[in-house]
Amino acid sequence: MRTATIPAPRTAGSYSVGIVCLGNICRSPMGEIVLRERVDEAGLSRHVRVASCGTGGWHVGNAMDHRAASALLSWGYDPSEHRAQQLAPHWFAEHDLLLAMDAANLAEMGGRSERVHLFRDHDPVAPGADVPDPYYGGEQGFNDVLHMVERVAAGLVATLQRTPGVTGPTGLP
């Protein structure tokens, strides 16, 4: 298994992750909420900020899809504060790492770069695979996405913990 790497932070002791999908009402907010919780559990919330957005603007200001919210609630997460945002040029300057949920989102973001990756590049089971969009399917699709997101979030936290500069000059909390 290869170990995914992430770029060093632009500012020592501060790291910002942005998660991007199409409409910011299903996959990326699920990723944001789960990763933020894992970051908090790891004691990194003082150093790591997590946000999400969509490449399209259809849902800006809306809460997440009720099926995504239901899946999160059933796993013990609180989705109530999420409001959809659209990707804008400032996201590239403000985030140390942007994670696209699928290849189409990645293409909308200009393709891979040092700071733009696929979300599942950090998945030990299927590195580089897409997170399928559950929007046009049933509830099981949302639970499947949540399983993927949980797995990737654990890997990302481990990567954040070992990346020099994330938590300060030495990389230690």
Predicted regions and their residues:
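Alpha-helix N-cap/helix-start capping motif
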Residues: 29, 102-103
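Conserved active-site segments centered on acidic
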Residues: 2-93, 158-172
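Phosphate-binding/catalytic loops
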Residues: 2-5, 97, 103-173
